[in-house]
């Protein structure tokens, strides 16, 4: 089966992960939808990680170079994924981080710099480790019953948007966190105090917030970008009674 798909930033390739006969050993494939093929035929897929008995996974598509992916491959240690930089056009793999620290995830800023790593212990507690040079500094921690995730960076890459329900919070809330000072600045939570924070949409060109959203019986958007709001309202008028969403 397939395990999700991505478009590259330039729309040149569709990327997807796939195993063989349900064995859960995943490879990453690329297909060019614009490739010229005979009528009734499909473009040929390329296996970018032609290794046996591995579970490769895509962590991020590059925001600066559409020919680059950040992926994880557990070829060295089956329990943990090392971080690689993959060049789509050539299949070249470059090791970015050898995972000997129980790292379960990686987060990159707007310039594709590795900034935060997620480390999980045997009890299910998770630490956010801030990367400064070769040093990894713990900056945030959640227990197994709490949630926290990074949902992008601010305009100058100095702070990240954190969605969390740590501590006495009943519902997930959006904050802006400074990884150096560890200071949290409240941004937003559900005005009706009924549902978790739903989603944050950021403009990849301006790096500013487009909208936030919350989902109960339907999804409600709070717009900060007038142009996007106008586009949304136009589509709502075209499809009355339907829910409209943007995907990228």
Where are these regions (language model features)?
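Peripheral, non-catalytic segments that deliver or gate enzyme domains
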Residues: 1-3, 9-248
């Amino acid at each position: 089966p397939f395990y999700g798909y991505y478009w590259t930033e330039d729309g040149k390739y569709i990327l997807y992960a796939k195993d063989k006969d349900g064995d859960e050993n995943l490879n990453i494939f690329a297909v060019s939808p614009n490739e010229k093929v005979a009528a009734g035929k499909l473009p040929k897929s390329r296996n970018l990680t032609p290794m046996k008995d591995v579970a490769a996974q895509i962590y991020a598509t590059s925001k600066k170079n559409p020919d680059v992916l950040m992926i994880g491959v557990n070829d060295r240690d089956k329990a943990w994924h090392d971080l690689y930089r993959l060049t789509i056009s050539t299949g070249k793999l470059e090791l970015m981080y050898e995972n000997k620290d129980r790292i379960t995830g990686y987060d990159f800023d707007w310039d594709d710099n590795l900034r935060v790593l997620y480390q999980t212990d045997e009890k299910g507690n998770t630490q956010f480790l801030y990367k400064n040079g070769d040093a990894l500094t713990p900056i945030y921690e959640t227990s197994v019953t709490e949630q926290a995730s990074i949902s992008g960076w601010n305009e100058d890459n100095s702070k990240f948007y954190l969605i969390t329900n740590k501590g006495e919070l009943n519902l997930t809330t959006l904050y802006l966190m400074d990884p150096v000072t560890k200071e949290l600045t409240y941004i937003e939570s559900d005005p009706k105090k009924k549902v978790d924070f739903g989603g944050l949409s950021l403009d990849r060109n301006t790096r500013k917030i487009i909208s936030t959203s919350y989902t109960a019986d339907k999804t409600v958007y709070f717009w900060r970008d007038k142009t996007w709001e106008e586009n949304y309202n136009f589509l709502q008028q075209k499809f009355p009674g339907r829910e409209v969403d943007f995907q990228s």
